[in-house]
């Protein structure tokens, strides 16, 4: 089993580059199934295990997928007749596999998709996806662990109001509606930058989508879509993690590819704490020194504070003075990393959906295990400043969302190694 071992205490300095966004590339790869004319080539694709998983799903659906890791590119040719079924073998590994349902319904009028797997954070229900497909005219039923969808009369544009701004449901409905007859309105839509990237990609393919990044998205269905070349946006969560790495070590680093507008809620909190940020055209420079000020954070759908940055921000807050409260409103069960932080001598108490952090914790190196993708990064961040050695296991979580994080931190001056036991 792999582990990452960190000896804390080094300030990070230098420059580091952000990869393409995991949460953008997965839906965009599935959207490539919509192109019945010409293959699509995606560039700035991160070399992640989740990308390999979704590529395997696309292959089972009869798409030809060529993964050019050395170029950070994937070519998807979905011009042949697609298979209707995404089997449990692959879908069970990752929740994003549910995103093939929208494109399959759009292209074939029917689909069978196994109920998904992925991170064990909360229930992450798929009711909003199903509600959207039914509104577009599909009949849905669940049987033997599979979702069966059939639109025998084709998908027809409609108005859909989401109960909450679900990112996955917004993406799935956009993809299904892009080839539906007529106009579809999605109200209370998710507004994440990854939604905008998906809409831009489909528009480049010949789609007619407006309003992405706002509460209301309009999709005018078209007859067909064609393959194009598209560059994936930088990963705002990786960028945020690296900014915090600079701040937590009281270092000075330049994060190339970090985009302020994609992470405004995070950078404003960092500035509130006394972290110095210099916004440049091609990235953000982060500098910090001395004591940081206490702030409270509350996770919310975009443009609020991202739940995917909650555990990393908690690591930074452990190094700040005063009383801090972290409130999680997006997912239940997203404080599983607290028990691991406590093994490192963190002073945290969880009360319901809030975690209370008292004073500056004198973090100590310990053996800890990652409980999910972002917790893995947060424990590594804590290890950068802990006294002594920290060993982080369960790195399969980390590999789902970060490319060579330990290598990037080492390049910036961290004393860190990945060891295969």
UniProtKB/Swiss-Prot annotation:
Phosphoenolpyruvate binds at residues 22-23. InterPro entries: Enolpyruvate_Tfrase_dom (IPR001986), Enolpyruvate_Tfrase_sf (IPR036968), MurA_subfamily (IPR050068), RNA3'P_cycl/enolpyr_Trfase_a/b (IPR013792), UDP_GlcNAc_COvinyl_MurA (IPR005750). GO terms for biological process: cell division; cell wall organization; peptidoglycan biosynthetic process; regulation of cell shape; UDP-N-acetylgalactosamine biosynthetic process. Pathway: Cell wall biogenesis; peptidoglycan biosynthesis. It is an enzyme of class 2 (transferase). It catalyses: phosphoenolpyruvate + UDP-N-acetyl-alpha-D-glucosamine = UDP-N-acetyl-3-O-(1-carboxyvinyl)-alpha-D-glucosamine + phosphate. It is found in: Cytoplasm. Keywords: Cell cycle, Cell division, Cell shape, Cell wall biogenesis/degradation, Cytoplasm, Peptidoglycan synthesis, Pyruvate, Transferase. The active site is at residue 119. The modification 2-(S-cysteinyl)pyruvic acid O-phosphothioketal is found at residue 119. The keyword Transferase applies. The keyword Membrane does not apply. One of its GO terms (cellular component) is cytoplasm. Its EC number is 2.5.1.7. UDP-N-acetyl-alpha-D-glucosamine binds at residues 95, 124-128, 308, 330. GO terms for molecular function: UDP-N-acetylglucosamine 1-carboxyvinyltransferase activity. Belongs to the EPSP synthase family. MurA subfamily. HAMAP family: MurA (MF_00111). Cell wall formation. Adds enolpyruvyl to UDP-N-acetylglucosamine. This is UDP-N-acetylglucosamine 1-carboxyvinyltransferase 1. It comes from Staphylococcus aureus (strain bovine RF122 / ET3-1).
């Amino acid at each position: 089993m792999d582990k990452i071992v960190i000896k804390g205490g080094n300030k990070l300095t230098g420059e580091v580059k952000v990869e393409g966004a995991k949460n953008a590339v997965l839906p965009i790869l599935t959207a490539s199934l919509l192109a019945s004319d010409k293959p699509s080539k995606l560039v700035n694709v991160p070399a992640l295990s989740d990308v390999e998983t979704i590529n395997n799903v696309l292959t089972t659906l009869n798409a030809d997928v060529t993964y050019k890791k050395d170029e950070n590119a994937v070519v998807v040719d979905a011009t042949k007749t697609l298979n209707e079924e995404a089997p449990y073998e692959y879908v069970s590994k990752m929740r994003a596999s549910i995103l093939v349902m929208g494109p399959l319904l759009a292209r074939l009028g029917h689909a069978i998709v196994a109920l998904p797997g992925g991170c064990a954070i909360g229930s992450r229900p798929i009711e909003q996806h199903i509600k959207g497909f039914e509104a577009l005219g599909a009949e849905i039923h669940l049987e033997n662990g599979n979702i069966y969808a059939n639109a025998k009369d084709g998908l027809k544009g409609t108005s859909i109001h989401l109960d909450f701004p679900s990112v996955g449901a917004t993406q799935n409905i956009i993809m299904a509606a892009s080839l539906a007859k007529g106009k579809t309105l999605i109200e209370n839509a998710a507004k994440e930058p990854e939604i905008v990237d998906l809409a831009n990609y489909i528009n480049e393919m010949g789609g007619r989508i407006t309003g992405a990044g706002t509460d209301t998205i309009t999709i005018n269905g078209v007859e067909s879509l064609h393959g194009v070349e598209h560059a994936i946006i930088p990963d705002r969560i990786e960028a945020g993690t690296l900014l915090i790495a600079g701040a937590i070590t009281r270092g000075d680093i330049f994060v190339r590819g970090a985009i302020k507008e994609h992470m405004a809620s995070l950078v404003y909190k960092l500035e509130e704490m006394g972290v110095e940020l210099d916004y440049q055209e091609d990235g953000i420079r982060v500098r910090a020194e001395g004591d940081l000020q206490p702030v409270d954070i509350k996770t919310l759908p975009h443009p609020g504070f991202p739940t995917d940055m909650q555990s990393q921000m908690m690591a930074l807050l452990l190094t700040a003075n005063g009383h801090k409260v972290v409130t999680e409103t997006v997912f239940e069960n997203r404080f599983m990393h607290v028990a691991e932080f406590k093994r490192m001598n963190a002073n945290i108490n969880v009360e319901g959906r809030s975690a209370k952090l008292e004073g500056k914790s004198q973090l100590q190196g310990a053996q800890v295990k990652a409980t999910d993708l972002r917790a893995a990064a947060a424990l590594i961040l804590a290890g950068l400043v802990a006294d002594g050695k920290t060993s982080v296991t369960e790195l399969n979580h980390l590999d789902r969302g970060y490319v060579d994080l330990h290598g990037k931190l080492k390049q910036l001056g961290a004393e860190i190694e990945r060891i295969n036991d």
